[in-house]
Design a protein with these regions (language model features):
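Catalytic-domain carbohydrate-binding cleft regions of carbohydrate-active enzymes
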Residues: 1-357
Length: 357
């Protein structure tokens, strides 16, 4: 019988580019959300309570946008909260479909170098939400990029998870190495379970259902993790009310204890039990990529563009190598347009389009 001592609660905004608003508006909103989350993290900075506010940055692209526009003082504040463990930066560029090949997936992880080297962020976790699967090349790439744990919060609307979730396991990569992985509940589930909303619903309705589910699948760990966004939904801001709700729940002495956490804290709780976890190998099956079929012509263009960008890389490298004299403008201009082109390629292969038609 499952006995859960601690429920790890991870709060983030779900980045869904173009779903609730046009793309430029989504990017602007997420910059505002990061600033708001920073303020809330600072408000709890001196608290050692398990309910103290913590924020997880779901994707790197929106953080890069924020860093580009933030003031030096705002960046210093963010760095301080990240260093204190009140904010965690995770490693995925966006919520990506399995349309990306190995080379393109590697491109999406390039921002980690900038975020680590230029800003000093510790990035050891990665997460994807909504999407149903990822290609088998991903665990090797994440391990090479210094990622120690990967979580998936799958949307089962027209989709499904390949394993009985929630499930913690080792995802064995083609190289034979393994990456800690968690196939968890949908990313909105914390709020739906009543966290931040109704202690009565959580205690009398949802938590008994969770425990029944854990018993049914023989879940063996004393910890489990649930994610939650703002009650607004996708592309929503930080939600301050989680703090008081979790503190009140923990003060009641009822089980389970809830810890407002970031992915790094979750994985720290899992690692002592790593030896007992199962090992799975292969693709993380995708049930849900409607976009391929709904826009086959555009998908073909994007694939062709990927090949052209690789040719451009080859020509650019040759031009730089054979130039009669060093030309800093050549390298600078190439890098500028290269980044923009690859970002646009990634955005096409980003999730959620062509569904429900």
């Amino acid at each position: 019988m499952a006995r859960i001592e601690t429920l790890y609660f991870i709060h983030h905004s779900h980045t869904d580019i173009g779903y609730t608003h046009d793309q430029p508006i989504v990017f602007d909103l997420h910059e505002r959300f990061i600033t708001q989350a920073l303020t809330l993290a600072e408000r709890s900075a001196d608290s050692d309570s398990d309910g103290a506010f913590r924020w997880t940055v779901e994707n790197t692209y929106v953080l890069l946008c924020w860093l580009q526009h933030a003031s030096p003082r705002e960046i210093e504040r963010f760095q301080a909260m990240e260093k204190a463990g009140r904010i965690e930066v995770t490693g995925m560029f966006a919520n990506l479909t399995p349309l990306l090949d190995v080379g393109q997936l590697a491109e999406t992880l390039q921002p980690l170098r900038t975020l680590r080297d230029d800003y000093g962020f510790t990035i050891t976790s990665a997460m994807n939400c909504d999407v149903n699967g990822e290609s088998w090349s991903l665990p090797d790439l994440l391990l090479d990029a210094g990622i120690e744990g990967f979580t998936m919060a799958i949307n089962t609307h027209f989709g499904g998870a390949p394993l009985a979730r929630p499930d913690v396991f080792h995802w064995q990569a083609p190289s034979g190495r393994t990456l800690l992985a968690y196939s968890g509940w949908p990313y909105d589930q914390g709020w739906r379970y009543g966290v931040g909303r109704s202690a009565e619903d959580f205690e009398q309705v949802w938590w008994p259902r969770v425990m029944a589910r854990l018993d049914a699948i023989d879940y063996s760990l004393p910890v489990v993790m649930v994610q939650s966004f703002h009650p607004f939904g996708d592309n929503g801001s930080a939600f301050a009310d989680f703090v008081a709700w979790i503190d009140a729940w923990n003060a009641s002495g009822k089980s389970p204890r809830i810890k407002f956490a970031t992915p790094r804290q979750w994985w720290a709780a899992v690692k002592p039990h790593a030896q007992q976890l199962p090992v799975y190998s292969g693709d993380w099956t995708d049930y849900w990529n409607f976009g391929c079929g709904s826009s086959a012509r555009e998908q073909t263009i994007n694939r062709q563009s990927r090949a052209r960008l690789r040719n451009a890389d080859a020509f650019g490298a040759a031009g730089l190598a054979t130039a009669a004299a060093a030309d800093p403008w050549l390298a600078r201009t190439f890098a500028l347009y290269r980044t923009e082109a690859w970002d646009n390629l990634h955005f096409w292969d980003e999730h959620t389009w062509g569904a429900d038609i």
